Amino acid sequence: MDYQAILDRILDTVDRDAYLTPSTQVDPDQRAALEQVGRALQSPDLEPGAARALVERLYEEGRIDRVMRLSALHVVAAHPAVADYALAARLAGEQELAALELGGPNLQANLASADRHRGVIAFLRGHTAIALDYFARALERERTAENLGNVLCALLRLGEVDDAASLLHQIREAYPPRVVAELAARIDQDPDLALLRDQEIDA
């Protein structure tokens, strides 16, 4: 794995058309439904079966599409309380195929989601360089605060603190205030990004 080549891809992506960065392309109705799943996963009394049942109910009610169903089921499978990484990997593959079959204007965002899920599995399994590659792919497809945060997490886990700090500075200079603010909130909340908290971020 050529770290410098991956880093160059990331820096090029951050430089390129930063102010054209879209907001998340999940439509508001689906986003609201997925937030229900997120709240269920944050519960201290998490029951994986109940979380999966919630995902299936939202799908049956037409509140999420097939791609988002597979994405949400992946998130449940990869949750630390479940840690079914074989299932999570299979669901990421199924999500990619579903995204290709669906096509449409959200294709790149849906493929970015599958790349992001693969990166999460690699990250949780200790293959951080591979995770960085997946996160870089996701960022190339969809330049969002979530994908930027994942790249920064992987850089820090690899011990590349200076590169992470430099990238953060570049993001602050190039990206819209909305994205910078979203990333700042994530840095404040995510323990994997704690080393960047002394890097001032102006929204």
What does each of the following model-derived ranges do?
Residues 40-43, 58-67, 97-108, 177-180:
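Flexible helix-coil transition and linker loops at the boundaries of alpha-helical arrays
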Residues 72-141, 146, 150-153, 157, ...:
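Alpha-helical adaptor scaffolds
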Residues 52, 68, 89, 132, ...:
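Conserved positions within tetratricopeptide repeat
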Residues 11, 15, 19, 23, ...:
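Amphipathic alpha-helical repeat scaffolds
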Residues 16-25, 45-46, 64, 82:
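Charged, low-complexity interaction regions
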Residues 106-115, 150-159, 179-199:
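TPR/TPR-like alpha-solenoid helical repeat scaffolds
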Residues 120, 124-126, 157-167, 191-203:
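Alpha-helical linker/edge segments of TPR/alpha-solenoid repeat scaffolds
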